[in-house]
Amino acid sequence: MIFFDIETNAITDWDKLSDLKEMFVISAFDVDKNRMISCSTPDRIEKLLDYMSKADAICGHNVIGFDLPALKKLYGFTHKRVIDTMIMSRCIFADIRESDFKRKDFPKELVGRHSLKSWGYRLGVMKDTHGETETWEKLTPEMITYCEQDVNVTKTLFYHLMKNDPSKQMLNLEHKFAALIKEQETNGFPFDEKKAEKLCAVLTSERVKIKTEMQDMFPPTIQKMKTYWYVDKKGNKYATKRAAVEAGLKPNQVEKGEQKTREIPFNPNSRDQIAERLIADGWKPEAYEGKRPAINEAVLKTIGTPVALKLCEYLMVSKRLGQLSEGQQAWLKLSKDERIHGSVNTNGAVSGRCTHNHPNVAQVPASRAPYGKECRELFTAPKGKVLVGADASGLELRCLAHYLWKWDDGAYAKEILEGDIHTANQNAAGLDNRDQAKTFIYAFLYGAGDAKIGSIVGGSRADGKRLKTSFFEKIPAIKKLVTAVERNVQLNKSLRGLDGRILACRSPHSAVNLLLQSAGAVIMKQALVEFAKLAQHPYELHGNIHDEVQFSCDKEHADDLGQAFCDGIKEAGKILEFRCPLDGEYSIGKNWAETH
């Protein structure tokens, strides 16, 4: 195996590497020969790359994210077996933030990070600091030393990671998935900037209108000031005694009058002011964020008064504008060449789920949400192509059925596949209707407490406890699963995922949710990998959000590729030895609103 690292000119376009022009040095450590090699001229670099191409494996840190795309662009280099210690680190130590807090003198800015610098501190093999002052304009001797030290840290990190005996199945899956997601990041998601600007104008106008309406609902408050007016015998007011004297009066001709006041207009952006006004109207807060009452759309909807609903509307419109144009990661600010290149951490959550930033496309509102359809219409297909959205059918409940199989011999799975699972859940919990059953089961799966469960039927914590008790009595396998999983966490502080990954779990209360969320994440990662093998036509990945993908292709190939992804989901189930059969569905359209 060969460990390697490269240094190039300064990069600003990390999505497409359009400004990558030159590689100054590549350093490689050959394990078999126990030798470090550094090359800095084009001919020697090409010879080293040829040598590396014959190695059984090459390993580097974040090489799938940068080094390999750079080498492919500059030298056409690829390799069939790549090991990325960044990916390994994120999978094996997904909860490293917790242990970092316990490390003595560990830099705060590196807590929870998986960078080489962070690992240098953890392992005592410090990364060279030259890169912090390098301009990356030309090759320097210090740059070569810096590159070689990165290779040394990577090598030490790799062997440290392997001591944890990570699941080979997990590592294989995560590397393949990360390579596909890198393609997605490079592709970006086509974004209709002109339509976005029109939506921005609509939302801005709506916010002004709502704000005006709220000034009538919430008159300004009168606040007393520390200063007083000065008044003459005729009743004329002066801001200060000095002002009266300057107006021609003698000091004994004015006297101290009433205390000054000022109007404080209601500020709908102030959560404190919102809470004060609502409490004055009789609201009693139930949830707090620190010492302040929690104020959000869900809380305001629960209050349900005309005033609260108007505030809710204002917060919603402001949130949409924040996502669209005003926030630091607003879509219009990040759109380049009418594409948004969102970043994805392929193992950003402890469960193995992806996390998203710059921007967080997972937070684009659903079509059913206010202005959700208008937001999703902004994310489109490239000119001349169609967008295909595919997702797994009933994934959460099928994951539950898989884990229940041990205790119910597939009864819950059979109800999902052949019956009406929501009606079955309704009857088991003793709920009034099917919609309540849907809300109940998903709240239960996401770890909702008794009070939250009780609120589904407009009841109390006691009602929630009663519903769960009935549910457990009618479907005893669920109670057995919950008990077994919570006991496992109490004993081991962890669970084992579908692909053998270790899931660190700090709370037995959230254990079932963690197990099911991880199963769904692993299935969808495997499904994407299988889809890439099954696809018989060209396509471009644009989005991978929880249990759905969005990709574009020629219209005549859309059905074939949509079905290929559904087949990929089924194949993922077989590979992962999933007990409940999996399936998927797809939609074809011009934009994201039409495909999910």
Placement of each model-derived feature along the sequence:
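Short active-site loop/helix that positions an aromatic residue
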Residues: 64-76, 88-95, 274-282, 393-408, ...
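Short, contiguous acidic/charged loop-to-helix segments that flank catalytic cores in large enzymes
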Residues: 263, 327-335, 365-367, 389, ...
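Active-site-proximal helix-loop-helix substrate-binding element of RNase H-like nuclease domains
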Residues: 21-24, 28-45, 56-162, 173, ...
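Conserved catalytic core of nucleic-acid polymerases
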Residues: 305, 346-349, 427-544, 553-555, ...
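Conserved "right-hand" nucleotidyltransferase catalytic core of DNA-directed polymerases
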Residues: 2-7, 18-20, 25-27, 106, ...
